[in-house]
Amino acid sequence: MKLFKNIVFAIVTTLAFVSTQAQANWMARGNNCYTYSEDGRYQIGISDRSLVVMGQFQCRAHYPMSDTVGINGRVYQALNICSPDMRLIPVISLANTDQAASAIASLKEARRARIRAFNETIIVNTDDIQACANSVAAVR
């Protein structure tokens, strides 16, 4: 049941992030904030409850599975999802509130955060992450 709740939360969070576009700037939308990786292949979304890394390409398999995400050298447990419900867009979600807050703190440690997900190193510019402070408490 907990896995199902995490999947549903990741889907809802992902759909909120998918509905807008931005490039290399942190943008707040409601209680969420998002940006793109430097290469534009990934969208990173944060909220008080989650951190989501979403590929801008289609995945092939249909699965929810346990995974990990590395942020500036710290490793977090995550859920990796590929589902037709999300248009086969691959998503890795930290749906645990404590882990999400810790991961967001890790993001803020460097001007160019290094996220290890999808077997790749994803570079994210965090210079203007403070734009999220009114939307995401962990950024304050």
Ranges and model annotations:
Residues M1-I11:
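Bacterial N-terminal signal peptides that target proteins for export
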Residues T14-A22:
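C-terminal segment of classical bacterial N-terminal signal peptides
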Residues A22-R140:
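A generic "folded-domain core" signal
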